[in-house]
Amino acid sequence: MTPHINAKIGDFYPQCLLCGDPLRVSYIAKKFLQDAKEITNVRNMLGFSGKYKGKGISLMGHGMGIASCTIYVTELIKTYQVKELLRIGTCGAISPKVGLKDIIMAMGASTDSKTNRVRFLNHDLSATPDFELSLRAYQTAKRLGIDLKVGNVFSSDFFYSFETHAFDLMAQYNHLAIEMEAAGLYATAMELSAKALCLCSVSDHLITKEALSPKERVESFDNMIILALEMMS
């Protein structure tokens, strides 16, 4: 047990899917897993363990932003011995290379947060995912006929950004979208010798102002859930 997770040791499988929204975690458990069991609920941040096609897998919410995400990731790795962490979330596109419903694999994560500079003695940290997880995601997407978009993301501390003038510059540097956690997830996994990857479904386009309806968000997210579960099975 940790200050933020009240699961017992052994409740988590070595592979864990992460979502910012705990209700989305519950949705995945009920719709996609067999024998799903709630294993933690501190602060209503839900976690489940169950099976997908006979293989054990866990789910955990992590809240919004790098600070919240890294708390849960640290405790999952250090206390519960989780080895592979796959974040599946939504993002806002900033590049003409991607559109609504596209799934992005974050091959690098820039950030306006100072957390990685603090942990890396004020140097620039290259926040990147695990290669083997990335390869599995790419190969699984090919098998499922999913056109996975690969590029960088920008992990912002601000949901309501005041640096919209920087979107064109980010796109020039092959940043496909903005989200809020990948840079912290990758850095924490690197520090603690775990494997991590972030997949994001485009729910909004910050340049064209297009946005999915609530129904479309669920449908597009389901495709990413299936990709995530298939690559972990």
UniProtKB/Swiss-Prot annotation:
Classify the source by domain of life: Bacteria
Q: Which amino acid positions bind a purine D-ribonucleoside, per UniProt?
A: 4, 179-181, 203-204
Supply the Pfam families for this chain: PNP_UDP_1 (PF01048)
One biological process term from GO is: purine nucleoside catabolic process
Q: Which InterPro entries match?
A: DeoD-type (IPR004402), Nucleoside_phosphorylase_CS (IPR018016), Nucleoside_phosphorylase_d (IPR000845), Nucleoside_phosphorylase_sf (IPR035994)
Please list the residues that bind phosphate.
Answer: 20, 24, 43, 87-90
Keywords, ordered alphabetically: Glycosyltransferase, Transferase
Gene Ontology CC terms, in alphabetical order: cytosol
Single GO MF descriptor: purine-nucleoside phosphorylase activity
User: What residues does the record give for site: Important for catalytic activity?
Assistant: 217
Query: Which PROSITE patterns does this chain map to?
Result: PNP_UDP_1 (PS01232)
Quaternary context: Homohexamer; trimer of homodimers.
Q: What is this protein called?
A: Purine nucleoside phosphorylase DeoD-type
What is the scientific name of the source organism?
Answer: Helicobacter pylori (strain HPAG1)
Please name the gene that encodes this protein: deoD
